[in-house]
């Protein structure tokens, strides 16, 4: 097994989570290559010590021992890997591909089968923890795949993860766990927004309400993280409203296939969809609070 700078890892998708993962690779001493359509993100990673960056991972694919794909959805994963300029055809046989996007179980299985056709190993490995944990190499990874995939991706997992859960050998299991996790995440944000909106309507200063909740039993990680954005009036997207429209849509699809009712998740999906329809889709997911009328929210601090 190669280690340190002998191990070449590529990452496609340099958003807040992907950039954090890439910087963790650099910090771990791995030879790091990055790809993103955003030239500024590529420049940031190059300045941090990456071996190379590009708008297309195919340009450096033959150098890689492992590839992490962390883009928005399954369609983007398939385009990155199997599109006209897809990277899969350029990877060395035996290269391990870690797919960390939040996607449906069926898509994970389909992608794994297609990668196997190129003699490539896939780890179905969605991640969580937010941008800060990603930057610190402390993400939670929910992974399923073969022992070989886990072994070949060991340097990658060690660099980015605070905790790795091995869900099983079948691709799709990791994605299912992540989807169920996103049910909770979305409901927590929606419930937090509803509570803060009620506080605003009742005339309670939102900084006071936030302080009370974060020091009491009603707190959650999502409330503490996301409602801080509301208090600060800062909706710069760390994870956008439209991400939860997608993720809670995956939750709904999963439940529908199992004929299983999800009343809270369904309501949360409707709230995020309403926020997106109102024009807030690209704002931080905490902007779901803006669907409530008759309240005044804090403005951005200068």
Curated annotation (Swiss-Prot):
Organism: Escherichia coli (strain K12)
EC number(s) per entry: 1.1.1.411
Lineage: Bacteria, Pseudomonadati, Pseudomonadota, Gammaproteobacteria, Enterobacterales
InterPro entries noted in UniProt: 3-OH-isobutyrate_DH-rel_CS (IPR002204), 6-PGluconate_DH-like_C_sf (IPR008927), 6PGD_dom2 (IPR013328), 6PGDH_NADP-bd (IPR006115), HIBADH-like_NADP-bd (IPR029154), HIBADH-related (IPR015815), LtnD (IPR050006), NAD(P)-bd_dom_sf (IPR036291)
Pfam families: NAD_binding_11, NAD_binding_2
Single GO BP term: organic acid catabolic process
Family: Belongs to the HIBADH-related family. L-threonate dehydrogenase subfamily.
Record-listed NAD(+) binding positions: 7-35, 102, 246
A GO MF term: oxidoreductase activity, acting on the CH-OH group of donors, NAD or NADP as acceptor
Name of the molecule in the record: L-threonate dehydrogenase
Source organism superkingdom: Bacteria
């Amino acid at each position: 097994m190669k280690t340190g700078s002998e191990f070449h890892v590529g990452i496609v998708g340099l958003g807040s989570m992907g950039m954090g993962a890439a910087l963790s690779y650099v910090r771990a001493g791995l030879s790091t290559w990055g790809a993103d359509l955003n030239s500024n993100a590529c420049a940031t990673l190059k300045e941090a010590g990456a071996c190379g960056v590009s708008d297309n991972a195919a340009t450096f694919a033959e150098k890689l021992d492992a590839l992490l794909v962390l883009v928005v959805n399954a369609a983007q994963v398939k385009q990155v890997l199997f599109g006209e300029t897809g990277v899969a055809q350029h990877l060395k046989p035996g290269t391990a591909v870690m797919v960390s996007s939040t996607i449906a179980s069926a898509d994970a299985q389909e992608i794994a089968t297609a990668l196997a056709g190129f003699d490539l190993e896939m780890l179905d490995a969605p991640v969580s923890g937010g941008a800060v944990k990603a930057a610190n190499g402390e993400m939670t990874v929910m992974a399923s795949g073969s022992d070989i995939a886990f072994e070949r991706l060991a340097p990658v997992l060690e660099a980015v993860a605070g905790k790795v859960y091995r869900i099983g050998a079948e691709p799709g299991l990791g994605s299912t766990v992540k989807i169920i996790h996103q049910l909770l995440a979305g409901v927590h944000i929606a419930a937090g927004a509803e509570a803060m909106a009620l506080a605003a309507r009742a005339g309670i200063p939102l900084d006071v309400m936030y302080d009370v909740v974060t020091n009491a039993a009603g707190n959650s990680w999502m409330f503490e993280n996301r409602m801080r954005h509301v208090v600060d009036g800062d909706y710069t997207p760390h994870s956008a409203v439209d991400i939860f429209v997608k993720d809670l849509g995956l939750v709904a699809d999963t439940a529908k296939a199992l004929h299983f009712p999800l009343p809270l998740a369904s309501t949360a999906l409707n709230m995020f969809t309403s926020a997106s329809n109102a024009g807030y889709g690209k704002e931080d997911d905490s902007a779901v609070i803006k669907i409530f009328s008759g309240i005044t929210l804090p403005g951005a601090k200068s």
